[in-house]
Every structure is written in structure tokens, then in C-alpha cells.
């Protein structure tokens, strides 16, 4: 099957036209309009330093429903000890850059290339992209970032500089997203790490149907502040 080359105008082909590995289209740009259109259609960018922009919609899709979150006994003990303090949107760009600097098994370079960093920083300034940070004292120890649309959160990447820091940030992020009535967390493709937290694969058709329902909910746009109570500041 031929790979669809994106036109200048913002549009995407039907995700059902994706290759078996999930590759759907090539080209385009990382403008806020195109990125938000992609996420709303269940499509995300993922490419390397020496390739054009590639767009994906894998089948099956890895998702986490907050009510299915599994926390191991050892991680629960770490959380109870209070080693890390978790915040939201305090260090978005730092989190993205730390994620970009992490080597991944089987990858020669990073997929979070400079233009990707710039694109998500723009989304953050527009109130659609968010980070959760784990701090040890005043040091950023770990974190994650993603995109929020309607009642869905699209996780992008995480990092840890200290033991369990990203895991603590992840657990707290899921707990807060559930409190804000986010019911669908997109984890994109299966990893054993996320599966241990309770993430599971579902058919793409089911994911898109659930995403459509999630998008009927209002987007929690703006800077998130975990000290703001039951709703993030700006929402």
C-alpha cells in the first residue's frame, strides 16, 4: 500500500489506510493546527533525525483507563515515603528536553528532534500540552509530557534521572487526570513498562470510537496547577 503524502492544507487520510505497522502518512509540518487535527483523529507524529515527518495510527492501540491503574507494592511504598513532590506545568520545556536526551533501547538517536521540541512548546503555550514533574528537593528528578484534548490525554514520553521518579510522576498524573474526569489515556504502542501499570491494547476502531466520545468533553486548556484543587488552573 502506498504511503499518503500530506498536502499543504491540513488534512489526513482515514486511519484505516495505515500500513500494518501503523504508518499512515509522510510530510506536512508540526504546526499547532496540524498536530491538534492529528491527535483528534487518533494520529501522532514519530520520526527520527534523518527522516521526513512520519504520521502513525497503529492497530492495536495501547491505552490506559485510569480506573485500571496498577501500582506495585514497592512503588506504593516509594510514593508513601514522599521522596518526590509532583507538580504540573512547572518545567514543561525542561521535561521535553530531558526526554529527548534519553537513549532508548534499539534506537540510535532520539525521535524528539529539535523541531518536535519547538512544536510541543508551542502547544504548551497554547494550553494544550502539559507536563508532570517529580522533584527531589529543588532538583527535577523525572517527569512526563503529553497533549490534552477533550476527555483524552495523549502521553508522549517520560524520563527519570533518579530511581522511580518517572513512575511516581506517572501514577500521580493518572490519579489527577481521573480526578479531572479524563477517562482515556493514549499510550500509543505497547511497552512492558506501561503494561505493568495496567495499560492494554484495544483495536484501533474501538480506540477511535472511544476517542470520539472523549472529544465531546471540554478540553482542560491552560496551565495546570495541582495546588488548584479539583480542577486545574486555567480549565
From Swiss-Prot:
Annotated catalysed reactions: N-terminal L-lysyl-[protein] + L-leucyl-tRNA(Leu) = N-terminal L-leucyl-L-lysyl-[protein] + tRNA(Leu) + H(+); N-terminal L-arginyl-[protein] + L-leucyl-tRNA(Leu) = N-terminal L-leucyl-L-arginyl-[protein] + tRNA(Leu) + H(+); L-phenylalanyl-tRNA(Phe) + an N-terminal L-alpha-aminoacyl-[protein] = an N-terminal L-phenylalanyl-L-alpha-aminoacyl-[protein] + tRNA(Phe)
Enzyme Commission number, as recorded: 2.3.2.6
Pfam (any one): Leu_Phe_trans
Keyword Transferase: yes
Primary localisation category: cytoplasm
Domain of life: Bacteria
Biological process according to GO: protein catabolic process
Record-level GO cellular component terms: cytoplasm
Reported function: Functions in the N-end rule pathway of protein degradation where it conjugates Leu, Phe and, less efficiently, Met from aminoacyl-tRNAs to the N-termini of proteins containing an N-terminal arginine or lysine.
NCBIfam families given in the database record: aat
Name assigned to this protein: Leucyl/phenylalanyl-tRNA--protein transferase
Gene: aat
